[in-house]
């Protein structure tokens, strides 16, 4: 069913000998069984086309099998990290594979129409060389994304620190973006300006008493510079020699003197620091999103080329030569994975020999010790045929 292709979270990549027939449906053609009988025809099944690769010795294949398993997991983890980063940036939904196209098509369509990229991964190379090429490229992409992500997080932290200076009430926040030169007495030998954050409930008290908080306060010099929900910010002009006396008395009356020496250079510097932090954060965010989305596509493509190699190597180890196999990718509707896998094992379990023959109750017997001679070398959890579950 085509709908399964777009609703599936799970895919099964399966390889069978070319002439294998389902024992649960004698006389049925294998392709017809996949499309019409498997879980009632609700799965979407398509051929997964893999070219023939240069095959070395049996020992070489076993080593490559182990390496492919490791690289498969590493690249899968890289994809998970990229999706996590994009989700953190609100650049993709939870179902990332539905929102990030591969080669301009949704992931399910890419899997349905998978083709080996012969220009990039040339077939005259050995399997070992192909593994190295794909692995190295994926590792470099992963490293690039992680490095850019670290730089972005650093810029984000710096911006948050700059933003904190602009937040909070007038008793604690930075004042560099609030005050103006005309709020201060500048370049005077004797006079200076003090800023005071006054709780709104004490505004009237301050206006009545500020001239008496110390000697040499300029009469009627207090004016409101700014106010918020909690405080009113006043400036007061007085003699420099009386600043300490004034601020001490102000604190005793629950007024809050703000330590602030007006400097156009400092104010300009602080504004530039904030603007620079904001600009860098935004620039790195754009760079990270672009890089992560590009890397996602490339790493995902690499991932399925590794899976193609893995299926091929495992199939040769299981079924031997010539390398003619029936390889399918199955889009499994939600909540049908266990049933689909069970029906596949019922139909093709005989390929595993006695280990997967049915017992007297008709159930697959996995306890037999006579597993395929390479089972312990090929897969941790042995299946009667080549099968990989892919969770997206």
Curated annotation (Swiss-Prot):
Biological function: Subunit of the V1 complex of vacuolar(H+)-ATPase (V-ATPase), a multisubunit enzyme composed of a peripheral complex (V1) that hydrolyzes ATP and a membrane integral complex (V0) that translocates protons. V-ATPase is responsible for acidifying and maintaining the pH of intracellular compartments. Subunit C is necessary for the assembly of the catalytic sector of the enzyme and is likely to have a specific function in its catalytic activity. Reversibly leaves the enzyme after glucose depletion, causing the catalytic subcomplex V1 to detach from the V0 section.
Presence of keyword Ion transport: yes
InterPro entries for the chain: ATPase_V1-cplx_csu, Vac_ATP_synth_c_sf
MF GO annotations: ATP binding; proton-transporting ATPase activity, rotational mechanism
Cellular compartments annotated: Vacuole membrane
Annotated protein name in UniProt: V-type proton ATPase subunit C
Predominant cellular place of this UniProt entry's protein: membrane
Note: Present with 21114 molecules/cell in log phase SD medium.
Family under the similarity heading: Belongs to the V-ATPase C subunit family.
Gene Ontology CC: fungal-type vacuole membrane; Golgi membrane; proton-transporting V-type ATPase complex; vacuolar proton-transporting V-type ATPase complex; vacuolar proton-transporting V-type ATPase, V1 domain
Keyword vocabulary terms for this entry: Acetylation, ATP-binding, Hydrogen ion transport, Ion transport, Membrane, Nucleotide-binding, Transport, Vacuole
Membrane topology: Peripheral membrane protein
Source organism of the structure: Saccharomyces cerevisiae (strain ATCC 204508 / S288c)
Any GO BP annotation: vacuolar acidification
């Amino acid at each position: 069913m085509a709908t399964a292709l777009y609703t599936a979270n799970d895919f099964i990549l399966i390889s069978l000998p070319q002439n294998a027939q389902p024992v649960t449906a004698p006389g049925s053609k294998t392709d017809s069984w996949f499309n019409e009988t498997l879980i009632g025809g609700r799965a979407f099944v398509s051929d997964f086309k893999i070219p023939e690769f240069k095959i070395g010795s049996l020992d070489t294949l076993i080593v490559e099998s182990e390496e492919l398993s490791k690289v498969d997991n590493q690249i899968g983890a890289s994809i998970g990290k990229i999706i996590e980063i994009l989700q953190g940036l609100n650049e993709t939904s939870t179902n990332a594979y539905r929102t990030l196209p591969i080669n301009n098509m949704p992931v399910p369509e890419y899997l349905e129409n998978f083709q080996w990229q012969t220009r990039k991964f040339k077939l005259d190379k050995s399997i070992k060389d192909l593994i190295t090429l794909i692995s190295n490229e994926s590792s470099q992409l992963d490293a690039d994304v992680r490095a850019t992500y670290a730089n972005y997080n650093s810029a984000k932290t710096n911006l948050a620190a700059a933003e904190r200076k602009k937040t909070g009430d007038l008793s604690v926040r930075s004042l560099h973006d609030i005050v103006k030169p005309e709020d201060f007495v500048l370049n005077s030998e004797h006079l200076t300006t003090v800023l005071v954050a006054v709780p709104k409930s004490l505004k009237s008290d301050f206006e009545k008493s500020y001239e008496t908080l110390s000697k040499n306060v300029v009469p009627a010099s207090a004016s409101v510079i700014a106010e918020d929900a909690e405080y009113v910010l006043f400036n007061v002009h007085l003699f420099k020699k009386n600043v300490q006396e004034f601020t001490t008395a102000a604190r005793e009356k629950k007024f809050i003197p703000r330590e602030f020496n007006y400097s156009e250079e400092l104010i300009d510097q602080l504004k530039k620091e904030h603007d620079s932090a904001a600009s860098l954060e935004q620039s790195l965010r754009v760079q990270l999103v672009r890089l992560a989305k590009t890397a996602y596509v490339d790493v995902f493509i690499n991932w399925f080329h590794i899976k193609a190699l893995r299926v091929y190597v495992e199939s040769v180890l299981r079924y031997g030569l010539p390398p003619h196999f029936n390889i399918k990718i199955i889009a499994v509707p939600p909540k049908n994975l266990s049933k689909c896998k069970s029906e596949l094992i019922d139909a093709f379990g005989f390929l595993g020999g006695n280990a997967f023959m049915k017992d007297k109750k008709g159930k697959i017997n996995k306890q037999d010790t006579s597993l395929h001679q390479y089972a312990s070398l090929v897969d941790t959890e042995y299946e009667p045929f080549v099968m990989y579950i892919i969770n997206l």
